[in-house]
Amino acid sequence: MRGLVFLVAACILAGTVGCGGTRGEAPKAYRRGESGPNPMPEEAPWKEADITLPPYPRDQDLILFEPRGQTTNRFYVDGSSLTVDPDRVIRFSLVIRSAEGARTVSYSGVNCKTAGWKDYAFGPDGDRWERVADPQWREIRDQQMNNHQYTLASEFFCYGGIFSGGPTGDAKSIVRHLKHPPTPDARVPARYN
């Protein structure tokens, strides 16, 4: 019986020693693009999708949200314009109303993976879009005043907060979340679909 236990233990030990690779070496970890028995495929470079400007925002489609920080402005997302595009950028119309009644309208995008914000167009005359000549991605930062970009990205758009790599869900679920936000203590959204 003792011999049988010893034989089983020896077989188990021999099996685990041989698992590492050739002659007890650890298995090689392959990086993206390297060749090997199970190489990781090359990741395609990110390409931004072509955009089509949505219809100009209508008051009945606006969803009020409250940004963190100090502001006297009111901030709205046009729920009918919000999309999650194949390039994983969330695009939407934003309306900002000042306490004095001035209105700023923009068509913007948020890239959760890079924590980037881009304005594609503005509505300077109140009923039509004017494209930005050379729109550029800018970093989203947590600020004290008019913190709408950070609030949208970290609390509504990006799963696990910004730099997360992905949107929280499809356009309908994000709009639903904007209409029914979590309690003020729930700052980082879960994935919701």
Label each region the model flagged.
Residues G15-G18:
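C-terminal motif of bacterial Sec signal peptides marking the signal peptidase cleavage site
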Residues G20-N193:
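N-terminal secretory-pathway/extracellular module detecting exported/lumenal segments
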